[in-house]
Amino acid sequence: MNNIPDDFKKIASSSRLPRKYCSSESSLSDDDGHEIEHVLKHGAPEEALTPDTERMVVLGQDVVQSAPASLVPGGNLSWMSKIKSAGASMMGSIRPSSSSQDVHSTGEIEKHSKKKWKARLWSTWNNIKYSSTWMSDRSDEYGGENDVVFLGRRYSTSVDESGLRSGFENFCSDYYSRLWITYRTDFPALLDTDTTTDCGWGCMIRTTQMMVAQAIMVNRFGRDWRFTRRKRSHVAAHGDEDDFDREKIQEWMILKLFEDKPTAPLGIHKMVGIAAMGKGKKAVGSWYSPSEAVFIMKKALTESSSPLTGNTAMLLSIDGRVHIRDIEVETKNWMKKLILVIVVRLGAAELNPIYVPHLMRLFAMESCLGITGGRPDHSSWFVGYYGDQIIYLDPHVAHEYIPIDINPNTNVVDSDSKKAKKCPEKSYHCRLLSKMHFFDMDPSCALCFQFESREQFDNDMRQLNLSQFIDIDQGEEHGMKRVRDPMFSVVYGERRQPPSYEREVSETEQAQADKHGFEML
């Protein structure tokens, strides 16, 4: 018990059942969900459209960042009614009218308009269902005796001598600096389909992108880098405009790796294209398991010609065994940095409590890239913990796709309104803190690490073995260092040949088997 984190001892002393803590979970009832689905499929009775509901539908990004006050539950008109009203207006716009028979007589125009508005309504529905905008500010839940452990860093949440919560503020800055890659709408169509959004099915791809983006950011800027949104006028006044531009350009170059367009080496178009080699058109709209998403990302990294990814290799283990020989091959004898992903199952139907201290230990490691997993059909990127709750970044928020231009003086203009669009940078950083109970986590997940050298890898694996968290196989000469409840095994020796149970079958045994109708295996 000496190796079990103090945080877990506090959890183990409590006998209460796990509760739901997911701060980005929707408050929709089942009836509300059915009503929305009915609106999506059949439309709703035409009603008056208020200014607030029109703003909610057309400005999809505003729904996420700053919902109108009139949409908050408890107003004069329920937000569900406004959703129906918005749906009625949008669906009504694609129905034939007596004043525009000449327009709707063209079937292709009607079909195109219907697809366009239905896709936008689906995006709005996903925003409502998954956005944490409807939840209250939970920053006051991070107070007391527990520390926040976040991707190898520990932050105190208590008030310091000056009366400030500087530790918690530093955690918020660190959390906000991580790249938050979410659903996108209105990007170029995927493959040869009309699909221009990944809402409802691309969450595991987005989760994997966030994990890899973290590795690239650490390689480029270091773990202590923090995102800043200083204005150019402020930067120019302090004389460091050139340095600011250089850093911003490098940051945007990393974002462009994951941009939602066909030419992005790690974007969703590239990943879906790789998946289509095996799935065909089912690659669009299909859910992906953690191992599938990582396998696709590994191939995308291998095919990437970007200098930002040239020194990075990825190794995926799906059987819970990491072979040092495989690592040496992938990294060319450690000439490249390693992203190591180990797919595990830490329980049958739910997370086994014995693995909670194991996960806590992982989040405290400098080499930790988090965990890709989530709840059933709801992928998330787990990045730390606070007490008995696991902290994560949720991709289930839809943002409008805006092209990324590394020229800081360039504005993107909307083709319809001819107005300049907002800088997309803000949508890649999340201010809303999301967390859930450890036991709400799906036991099927992928443990992610990044190692710069063989020395760092050996040291971390040795510490995990001494903490009774993993097995180490040192080869046939030196034997195994086993633990009671390992998450995975590291094999340093040559690949062991599985035991062979084959032997020659005698004529008598074969005759007996034939007589009784058995097959000799």
Swiss-Prot record:
Keywords per UniProt: Autophagy, Cytoplasm, Hydrolase, Protease, Protein transport, Thiol protease, Transport
Single Gene Ontology BP annotation: mitophagy
Region named Disordered: 90-109, 499-521
Main subcellular location of this protein, as a coarse class: cytoplasm
Active-site residues per Swiss-Prot or TrEMBL entry: C203, D394, H396
Phenotype upon changing G373R: In ola316; defective maturation of autophagosomes with increased numbers of immature autophagic vacuoles. Increases the number of lgg-1-containing protein aggregates in neuronal cell bodies, but not neurites, of AIY interneurons
GO cellular component terms, A-Z: cytoplasm
Pfam families registered for this protein in UniProt: Peptidase_C54 (PF03416)
EC number of the protein: 3.4.22.-
Biased composition (Low complexity): 90-100
Catalytic activity from the UniProt record: [protein]-C-terminal L-amino acid-glycyl-phosphatidylethanolamide + H2O = [protein]-C-terminal L-amino acid-glycine + a 1,2-diacyl-sn-glycero-3-phosphoethanolamine
Classification via InterPro entries: Papain-like_cys_pep_sf, Peptidase_C54, Peptidase_C54_cat
Keyword Protein transport appears in the UniProt entry: yes
GO molecular function: cysteine-type endopeptidase activity; protein-phosphatidylethanolamide deconjugating activity
Entry similarity comment: Belongs to the peptidase C54 family.
Function: Cysteine protease required for autophagy. Cleaves the C-terminal amino acid of ATG8 family proteins lgg-1, to reveal a C-terminal glycine. Exposure of the glycine at the C-terminus is essential for ATG8 proteins conjugation to phosphatidylethanolamine (PE) and insertion to membranes, which is necessary for autophagy. Its cleavage activity is functionally redundant to atg-4.1, but it cleaves lgg-1 precursors less efficiently than atg-4.1. In contrast to atg-4.1, plays a more significant role in the later phases of autophagy and in addition has a role in autophagosome maturation.
Record's protein name: Cysteine protease atg-4.2
Organism, scientific name: Caenorhabditis elegans
Gene giving rise to this polypeptide: atg-4.2
